[in-house]
Amino acid sequence: MPWRIHKKRHLTSFQVIILGFAGVILFGALILMLPISSAQGIITPFHKALFTSTSAVCVTGLVVLDTGSYWSVFGQTVIMFLIQIGGLGVITTATSVFILSGRKISIMQRSTMQNAISAPKVGGIVRLMSFILKGTLLIELIGALFMIPVFCHDFGLRGIWMSIFHSVSAFCNAGFDLLGTKWHPFVSLTSYAVNPVINIVIMLLIIIGGIGFFTWEDIYLHKFHFKHYHMQSKVILTTTLCLILLPAVFFFFQDYGNLSGIHRLLAALFQAVTPRTAGFNTTDLSMLTGASKAMMILLMLIGGSPSSTAGGMKTTTFALLLLNVLATFQRCDDVTAFGRRIDASVIKNATTIAMMYFILFFAGGMTISVYEGLPLSSCLFEAASAVGTVGLTLGITPKLHILSQIILIILMYLGRVGGLTLIYAVFSDKNKRKARLPLDKIIVG
């Protein structure tokens, strides 16, 4: 029988990305299981360690164990590093290690880096990675320095560690906090609801981390000359501004009637910023009106911007869907923005991503509701928080059974790796149809 020669198969860059995230999550879970990771020196059950590690790497912030009271300083440090790796991306972090060690980056590694941060080209990718790493560390350091006086006033020298942790958590849009205690767990930033320093610094870190690395580069190179920015940066900044101001006005008039002028404005602004994948909260979310919860679900699904520390289906996806609707109203064949025509394939990708997120959101929420016997609205809120990698909760996540927590783990993972990355990793382009079939039309609407 003749020998068959099998061609050696290599992992694609997209497969490397999704397996890289999975590997870091599993490694983090094993470390968090160790007695040294818990404050009481006990072994943490695997499913709870896995949930925490997934939430950290996927920069979500949903927790089943209070971060401030359950985990030791070692465990909290592990969580912070997992957040940093997840925020920058597994590939970006690994590349940063290569850059710092002075090792050469291969063409395959450069291609993987390009796909990891959705860079338009391979050229200059190492320089961009270096810019991202330096910018991240500088911004997180500045954020921590601003918060140190407040936290040191309340917690003494421990406030330095808390400032660093919360700065990393906010910049990476993770939403983990250390403010819970054994008697009052899962409190987030509610004790700082009227503190302007903490509110403003956390909001700025969330926004800067969520607008994307390429937008940073545009601002760095062109300063505040908006007309010189790339179209993507223009779309991101415009959409981000609208998604902050409009919901803030809504929250201002809809909720927080118990707060006075400036404090009410601060709470409304914070509540508009944090659902876009950050996960911090300064007020009790269970007390919000149904309309406010619905608004937050929409914001959680939209998320941050491409090539950023944030998750969700992304601001550009949402903007392109709206622009497509606008083009239909105007009876235009092309979707345009800022004097440029947008490729039809990009619109198709945006529609695909949006459908994936909405399907995962509804399927996850309904499954949890049926299994747990909880109100559908509450379960949809948790599902949106998971798939949008946000971390906001109505308080039911720690009380869910293991199966429901596994569903949230899957949603967090899929929400972080991204719709297109998952599609390109699973489905080969060999299935791409080479010949074009006859054109036909279907009546819609």
Q: Which residue stretches match the model-derived regions?
A:
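Membrane-proximal intracellular helices of multi-pass ion channels
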Residues: M1-G445
